[in-house]
């Protein structure tokens, strides 16, 4: 048997995950479980971004006519698809980063500026990301307080992430360094064009 060439970049690791959107939709439709779910999967800056993007859609009154109910169901399905994609992305990052035991609050999925894509950040030092259900506040005052923390400087390792949706499923793939190289913390990887 001829010798096989090694993989050209042995320092890369890949992770993937799939999430069933109707499962997340059941949580979105449950007023008691939904805030717990958001606090479990998102860091504070991610919750603030979610709140800014979806607050008005989730605060709408229950529609009284059939057309209104169908529109609300469509909107909630879109929110569930977004959350399922973020869940799958975080799980993919956790699977790709075998060099460290990660939990959901160790990972941020962020939107690229000037693009529709996303990328992941594996946080180096984790501040308590979980908060009580009351921390997720739909009021304007709650939004302002949370939005101020978006700019909080936190170091971490950037990883490549791709999210895709098809029918009832959201899937994500992550490509990450097996172990962060010295100097790949705090934006140096981005400066070298690694993402």
Language-model segments: which ranges?
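Core catalytic alpha/beta fold that binds nucleotide/phospho-ligands
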Residues: 1-195
């Amino acid at each position: 048997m001829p010798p096989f060439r090694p993989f050209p970049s042995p320092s890369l690791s890949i992770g993937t995950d799939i999430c069933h959107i109707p499962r997340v939709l059941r949580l979105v439709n449950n007023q008691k479980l939904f805030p717990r779910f958001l606090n479990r999967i998102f860091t504070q800056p991610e919750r603030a971004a979610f709140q800014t993007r979806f607050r008005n859609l989730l605060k709408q009154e229950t529609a009284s006519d059939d057309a209104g109910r169908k529109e609300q169901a469509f909107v909630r399905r879109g929110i569930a698809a977004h959350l399922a994609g973020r869940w799958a992305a975080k799980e993919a990052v956790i699977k790709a980063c075998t060099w460290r035991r990660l939990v959901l609050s160790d990972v941020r999925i962020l939107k690229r500026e000037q693009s529709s894509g996303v990328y992941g950040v594996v946080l180096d030092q984790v501040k308590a990301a979980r908060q009580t259900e009351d921390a997720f506040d739909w009021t304007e005052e709650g939004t302002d307080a949370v939005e101020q923390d978006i700019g909080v400087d936190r170091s971490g390792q950037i990883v490549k992430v791709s999210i895709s949706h098809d029918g009832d499923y959201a899937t994500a793939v992550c490509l990450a360094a097996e172990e962060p190289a010295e100097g790949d913390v705090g934006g140096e990887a981005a400066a070298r064009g690694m993402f």
